[in-house]
C-alpha cells in the first residue's frame, strides 16, 4: 500500500502513497494514520497526514528509522477497515467582499456567476486535509471546469470566510491571511 518509505531528516520518516490526489489514496493515508495512532507506539512523537503522504516524527532516543520503518511495514492495514466520516455544512457568503475571483472565473469559464455558484453549490466535497493555515480545509474533487490556477502573485490579504478555488481544491479561509 505504501509505495516508498524514506528518511526525512534524522528523526522523521516519509511514507509516500503515490503522486495522485484521489479518495482511494487519501483513504490509505488515513487508515495508516489512524492505525498508528491506535497502536500508540512509544517513540513516535507526531503524525502528519496529507493528500497522499504521511510524515512520522520520532524520538531518536527511543527508536530509529529502521525500527519505525519495520513497525509501519508490519502493520496489518486492510481496505475493509471502515473509516469514520462526518458531513459538515459550511456556510458560504457570496458577497463581493468574499468572492474575490468571481470576475476572473466568469471570464475564464464564459458563464455567469449564478451558473458558477450553481455548479459549486450543487456538489458535495471531500476534505483531503486541513492545513496551510490552522483548520483550513482542502475540499477536493472540484469539477474540471471550475478549476483555476494559482494567482501568479498571491494576495496580501484574503478575508476570513473567503472560498478560494485553486487547482482541484476549494479552500475556506479560516483566518484572514495571504493567499
Where are these regions (language model features)?
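Glycine-rich active-site loops that engage anionic ligands at enzyme catalytic sites
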Residues: 1-179
Amino acid at each position: 500500500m505504501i509505495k516508498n518509505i524514506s528518511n526525512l531528516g534524522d528523526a522523521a520518516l516519509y511514507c509516500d502513497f503515490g503522486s495522485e490526489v484521489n479518495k482511494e489514496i487519501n483513504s490509505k493515508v488515513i487508515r495508516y494514520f489512524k492505525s498508528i495512532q491506535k497502536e500508540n507506539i512509544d517513540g513516535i512523537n507526531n503524525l502528519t497526514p496529507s493528500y497522499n503522504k504521511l510524515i512520522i516524527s520520532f524520538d531518536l532516543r527511543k527508536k530509529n528509522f529502521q525500527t519505525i520503518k519495520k513497525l509501519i511495514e508490519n502493520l496489518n492495514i486492510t481496505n475493509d477497515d471502515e473509516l469514520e466520516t462526518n458531513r459538515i455544512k459550511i456556510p458560504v457568503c457570496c458577497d463581493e467582499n468574499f468572492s474575490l475571483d468571481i470576475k476572473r472565473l466568469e471570464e475564464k469559464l464564459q458563464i455567469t456567476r449564478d451558473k458558477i455558484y450553481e455548479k459549486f453549490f450543487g456538489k458535495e466535497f471531500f476534505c483531503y486535509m486541513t492545513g496551510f493555515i490552522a483548520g483550513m480545509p482542502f475540499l477536493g474533487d472540484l469539477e474540471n471546469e471550475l478549476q483555476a490556477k494559482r494567482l501568479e502573485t498571491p494576495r496580501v490579504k484574503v478575508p476570513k470566510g473567503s472560498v478560494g478555488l485553486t487547482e482541484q481544491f476549494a479552500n475556506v479561509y479560516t483566518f484572514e491571511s495571504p493567499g
